[in-house]
Amino acid sequence: WEAGASLQPTLTMVAGNFSATAWGSVDFAATSYKEMDLTLAYALGPVTFSLADLYWEGGAGNRGTVSRSYFRFGADSPHRVEAGITWRISERVPLTLAWNTVLFGAADVNARGERAYATYAEASYPFAVKGVEMKAGIGIVPWNAVGTYGIDRDFYIQNIFLNAGKSWTVLGSLQ
């Protein structure tokens, strides 16, 4: 949301109802935005539970207060741990609702220095156009931490989006 045009590779491995995903982002601009997210998830019917480690060094304005070391887990850690739940209403009406809350991390404090439990909620609708997977939606922040989404205020619209992607199966089966 603050980086502009970016390369965002994703690698997902699935075994039964479990999945592990590595997602990264690096921009093409001078902001040097970098993020690396590792997510474990479990699908239970139309509901998916997830736990993610979000590594982000922060924007240019807070790089002095957040460590740039990937293996730093102290008060100035660039990591956040986030719990999420996603619900796909039905196959016929594939509207998806998601709720993600930061449980801890150096940037999850409000302007007063209190733990904020920054939260992001999203409604999205998937569809396909000529074999390209698409998704349109809206994301909101019901409450926030200044170090997580850049501002410290209550409810606001974070993003309105239209995504397009193409997936390829690299290995059909490892059995």
Name the predicted role of every residue range.
Residues 29-122, 149-155:
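Outer-membrane pore/translocation modules
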Residues 4, 17, 88-175:
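Outer-membrane beta-barrel transmembrane domain signature
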Residues 11, 85, 125:
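Short, exposed beta-strand/loop patches in secreted or surface proteins that constitute
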Residues 1-28:
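Short glycine/proline- and aromatic-enriched beta-strand/turn motifs that initiate or cap beta-hairpins
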